[in-house]
Amino acid sequence: MDHFVEFEDVCKYYQTGSVKIAAADHMNFYVDKGEFCIIVGPSGAGKTTLLNILGGMDSCDEGHVWLDGRDVSRFSEKALTTYRRYDVGFVFQFYNLVQNLTALENVELAAQICRDPLDAAEVLGQVGLSDRLSNFPSQLSGGEQQRVSIARALAKNPKLLLCDEPTGALDYKTGKQVLALLQRTCRETGRTVIVITHNTALTAMADRIIQVKSGQILSNQVNEHPVPVEQIEW
């Protein structure tokens, strides 16, 4: 197993009445350590199923899922809980912040359950919120709240950062700022970042582009010349 992340013939089925649907249909792909990867495809393509399996929030019915040399698909429920807690940071479309905690307290809350967390205030500073530590979510803009959620994920010091449509609830300008932050985080820390999106324009900023359709991997390509998100229009 030479790759940092690898799906090996992964299948996930759902039963709808008498119909069996393959949300993941023999998926094969890999991502190398430190890459900024974008997984792109239309709604219903299987992107979120893929993310849920890779993030340990769901299990596959067939195949193997590897992260850093370990077969996640063979983990027990207890091992999966440990995996989600320590190894993976999650950023979703909606921020899911605790409303009666400050920005700093939201990040500290996540850091407290981890083995080797980063300093919460320092990480908030890295995402441009050093002057907003004491603000509650209701006092922050959408972009600032998403930055808190990114800081919360990074403070766990995870091996892998998974982002599911992280700009979906943001306006164009703010969305670009958040994507720039994710790209910079990958470059500066060497952390592996995977972003799931339906927006094909964003693939220009990725080191690796994985296309998904109808539960299958259409392509897995390296982008030799990724560009800053500031240069991308959509």
Task: Name each region found by the language model.
Residues 3-205, 209-212:
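ABC family nucleotide-binding domain
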Residues 216-234:
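Conserved beta-strand-loop-alpha-helix hinge in the C-terminal portion
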